Amino acid sequence: MNPIVKSFEYGQHTVTLETGVIARQADGAVMASMGDTTVLVTVVGKKEADPGRDFFPLTVNYQEKTYAAGKIPGGFFKREGRPSEDETLIARLIDRPIRPLFPDDFTNEVQVIITVVSVDPQIEPDIVSMIGTSAALAISGIPFNGPLGAARVGYVNGEYVLNPGAAELAGSELDLVVAGTQSAVLMVESEAKSLPEEVMLGAVVYGHDQQQVVINAINEFAAEAGKPRWNWTAPVKNEALVAQIKELAEEGLTAAYQIMAKQERYEAVGEVKKATIAKLQEANPDVNVREAADLLGSLEKNVVRGRIIAGMPRIDGREPDMIRALSVMAGVLPRTHGSALFTRGETQALVTCTLGTERDAQKIDSIMGERTNRFMLHYNFPPYSVGETGMVGSPKRREIGHGKLAWRGINAVMPSAEEFPYSVRVVSEITESNGSSSMASVCGTSLALMDAGVPIKTSVAGIAMGLVKEGDNFVVLSDILGDEDHLGDMDFKVAGTRDGVTALQMDIKIEGITKEIMEIALQQAYGARVHILNVMDQAIGSARPDISDFAPRITTIKINPEKIRDVIGKGGAVIRALTEETGTTIELEDDGTVKIASNNGDATREAIRRIEEITSEVEVGRLYTGKVIRIVDFGAFVNILPGKDGLVHISQISDERVANVSDHLQLNQEVTVKVMEVDRQGRVRLSIKEAQVKEPAAE
């Protein structure tokens, strides 16, 4: 075994790429490390494509092994299970920038597996995983137009920071991941605290500039360790068939793409394609139907793009910067804690908000450590939203990714736990879809949160931008349709407030996207965002003053931290009795904060009264009403507060002489007593005869 190793400095860390020792039967295998965070990346591709396949079957599997953090998995089986949400998101993060770098007609199956084998809690594995994937593909010999670089950019004290650690990222106003080739940005994923557009654009440019060191290092690594390139050539295009299809279908496709309603348009396009294939088969029974279908798809793309570049109206008749018709409603469901229906053209989101207590928060135990998520946003994309049938069940990768993007867009305006001590779950049900459903979810979430009385800092809206570029000519499109996303060169989603950007996601399919184009897209997105916010604010412009009658009301009180154990009781007996008997939910924190949640105000007040009883101190000179719990020869013990008993000496029972305690007191008898003394050992001396005055007793 002769290892080939390449190391280079990248930001605050040393990155090392190594091959030739592990997983030598894979087409490409790289052990990539950044500090103590190490991943094994393997790439395997099939030498032959399956006959009849008309798509590129790329699979990216990202898996975090608990041994990487020195942990044993939980659960009965004690082994890793299905991918977590974090693993799914990182797999998508790696997939998105590498997919457009494979040749257009390449349909051989390729599988990339990234395994995290060691982790430093301060260094996230995502960036080194992207670097390792790029290196493994570069040395594999598989057709790949890389290498690819990747960088994380933070923004601390007005300065950009390259690959900040977890501690530094906690104080950053920006968490942006950018990936690209030597000449082009391909992918951006970010979350920000309402930063101006120019700061966001500057971060993208900064990250792309800094990652050139990665690209150069991978090129040097591949020159030394790379396998011979596969002998693969793109299939030769049948120009005669191209011309024939253009003659038969161009006019019909042009007419079909002037139909504004999505379903009617799809039917018309389908009829044109069906008629074209039939005419081709009539003229030549041996025509390759799959090839003809592919060429029809290319013609369809050219027709739509050509009209846009020529300055003609878009598919639905809009100008490039126009937004579709908006319909905004808040409070649409009677029993939910908050709800909204946001409709933009043929895209619609029904969004609900549910409030819960701290115990409803999501507890996440990952290899990076444990964390609690008080704000959850779940996105569902049922098949009926696009007029189709399909499987319904657990969320797919796309749904998890879209939900996280919407979460990033909203998270910057969420109140702190001190301002609003609730856990919040938002669910976005996409009931209609024709482009930009994730951004509709952002708008709907902002509305539903306000309807639920969540004091978010300000309204948030999202918009999806597109691009059509031919040579030096380009058109930036606002509020893209699904077809414009599919047929265009860029998907550029921006969420934010009037003051700045809270989330930015960008996927670019071509090279040559300049800083100028991104700047125009961001400014156009700002105008669209403000327009949407104005419409949203007409429906509901700020959080409702009170939460729903159906939501739990949380009341917070403070107790002496030393009294927490008294409230909990032995084996949790006291707090369990409190919650069951009052019908409330009670949560205790180490600093003595007690949160009582209930839909019933009387139940909350009763729980507070009982907690105050348990935690209160016995006051000398105060009267208490208690029960006799034990009788002895020299007196009786009386319980005056939960967990607090005192002795009434036989001489303090009555003004008269008492010979036998049982003649005057019985077990469980209620008596009023006065506290005479609490000694150094906490023992309480009580008197019944001194309490025989006209004063109200403490309950």
UniProtKB/Swiss-Prot annotation:
SMART domains the record matches: KH, S1
Record-given protein name: Polyribonucleotide nucleotidyltransferase
Domain S1 motif: 621-689
Family per similarity comment: Belongs to the polyribonucleotide nucleotidyltransferase family.
The organism of origin for this protein: Shewanella amazonensis (strain ATCC BAA-1098 / SB2B)
Reaction equations catalysed: RNA(n+1) + phosphate = RNA(n) + a ribonucleoside 5'-diphosphate
Gene that encodes it: pnp
InterPro entries in the record: ExoRNase_PH_dom1, ExoRNase_PH_dom2, ExoRNase_PH_dom2_sf, KH_dom, KH_dom_type_1, KH_dom_type_1_sf, NA-bd_OB-fold, PNPase
Entry's EC annotation: 2.7.7.8
One CC-aspect GO term: cytosol
Compartments reported by the entry: Cytoplasm
A Gene Ontology BP annotation from the UniProt entry: RNA processing
Cofactor: Mg(2+)
NCBIfam families referenced in this protein's UniProt entry, alphabetically: polynuc_phos, PRK11824.1
Subunit structure: Component of the RNA degradosome, which is a multiprotein complex involved in RNA processing and mRNA degradation.
Organism domain of life: Bacteria
Main location: cytoplasm
EC class: transferase
Pfam families documented for this protein: KH_1, PNPase, RNase_PH, RNase_PH_C, S1
Keyword annotations: Cytoplasm, Magnesium, Metal-binding, Nucleotidyltransferase, RNA-binding, Transferase
GO molecular function, one term: magnesium ion binding
